[in-house]
């Protein structure tokens, strides 16, 4: 029989590398001759500097205390990097945002404060966990907050109230108080509620996320959030949604307004999946129909609507934020019915803000302003009735405002018989 010859398989040679003369290499064994330095030098182009250093270190550590003898080379542990041409990397897509972004805010007293802007990419999957029978939706870049302080923790609430009162006076900001802008924060975080869909409102503090934080109507509210952030850090058990609404209540009362009903227990959303769409806040340049539709969407009637708009007697417009400029009343840090009185008593003429081109109404000496939605309150006969009522009876205005604002703070919140907020699974 003819002998079958086995095919000759070419042996694959290991990549060569230059080594120190103190290391002599054969095909299968290696003789280590100890030297004072006990180092192995390996030639490598700059791109392989890290690999070469790692190889040299591994050989040095392997035979640091070895005596002169022949041992087998462990190729699985000691590998000499071959000299190859570096591959050209393909263009990579933009990196996914996986960490909270911190916005540094220049505060009026020249101090800087940080506010976390949490962003969850739309395509990032959620991680589902089980916690006490409730499905928990979590992401890698947010801290899960499942509940706020208890309704029975009166002492804790009082401490938070005291801390809020301390940040309100600000002599170098606007008219000397942060009360109006903090009230606006509380107002806007609630005014996204939609009674037809059931989403929006203060529960969840969704203004921490885009797109709500970038809504044009919320421009300038970073000042209020920044002022309250140290309180949140000092009292971590209270949620942002409870803190912001409580701060709105305290601001009204500290500026001489009525006592506002408020209860704790709101939760904070863990990501942006339940952020309402932008455009739900009232637009100041629109007409009475827009006002009625916007407030009607939240569940308010004409009387409640006019009473809530009386808060325009506080604070002022800033052209750097909204494009409008000026104050509504002579005492913008004092809660009263002056807004209605000024609206009826002054003569208003349409003008523009020179720097922005935005239209607004001025009184004769241009010391006070009104927006188009304000003027609509005296154009619409149904709204005008309540404007006249509140201009003549401040006590009635205070009572109606307290009821309407308390209702605003509770939009979208369900409670049990003990006052505890009933959890919504989508917030957890």
Swiss-Prot record:
<keyword id="KW-0349">Heme</keyword>
<dbReference type="InterPro" id="IPR002207">
    <property type="entry name" value="Peroxidase_I"/>
</dbReference>
<keyword id="KW-0408">Iron</keyword>
<dbReference type="GO" id="GO:0000302">
    <property type="term" value="P:response to reactive oxygen species"/>
</dbReference>
<feature type="compositionally biased region" description="Polar residues">
    <location>
        <begin position="21"/>
        <end position="32"/>
    </location>
</feature>
<dbReference type="GO" id="GO:0046872">
    <property type="term" value="F:metal ion binding"/>
</dbReference>
<protein>
    <recommendedName>
        <fullName>Putative heme-binding peroxidase</fullName>
        <ecNumber>1.11.1.-</ecNumber>
    </recommendedName>
</protein>
<dbReference type="InterPro" id="IPR044831">
    <property type="entry name" value="Ccp1-like"/>
</dbReference>
<feature type="active site" description="Proton acceptor">
    <location>
        <position position="188"/>
    </location>
</feature>
<comment type="similarity">
    <text>Belongs to the peroxidase family. Cytochrome c peroxidase subfamily.</text>
</comment>
<feature type="binding site" description="axial binding residue">
    <location>
        <position position="312"/>
    </location>
    <ligand>
        <name>heme b</name>
    </ligand>
</feature>
<dbReference type="InterPro" id="IPR010255">
    <property type="entry name" value="Haem_peroxidase_sf"/>
</dbReference>
<keyword id="KW-0575">Peroxidase</keyword>
<feature type="region of interest" description="Disordered">
    <location>
        <begin position="1"/>
        <end position="33"/>
    </location>
</feature>
<feature type="active site" description="Tryptophan radical intermediate">
    <location>
        <position position="328"/>
    </location>
</feature>
<dbReference type="InterPro" id="IPR002016">
    <property type="entry name" value="Haem_peroxidase"/>
</dbReference>
<dbReference type="GO" id="GO:0042744">
    <property type="term" value="P:hydrogen peroxide catabolic process"/>
</dbReference>
<dbReference type="GO" id="GO:0004601">
    <property type="term" value="F:peroxidase activity"/>
</dbReference>
<dbReference type="GO" id="GO:0020037">
    <property type="term" value="F:heme binding"/>
</dbReference>
<comment type="function">
    <text>Destroys radicals which are normally produced within the cells and which are toxic to biological systems.</text>
</comment>
<dbReference type="GO" id="GO:0034599">
    <property type="term" value="P:cellular response to oxidative stress"/>
</dbReference>
<keyword id="KW-0560">Oxidoreductase</keyword>
<dbReference type="Pfam" id="PF00141">
    <property type="entry name" value="peroxidase"/>
</dbReference>
<dbReference type="InterPro" id="IPR019794">
    <property type="entry name" value="Peroxidases_AS"/>
</dbReference>
<feature type="site" description="Transition state stabilizer">
    <location>
        <position position="184"/>
    </location>
</feature>
<keyword id="KW-0479">Metal-binding</keyword>
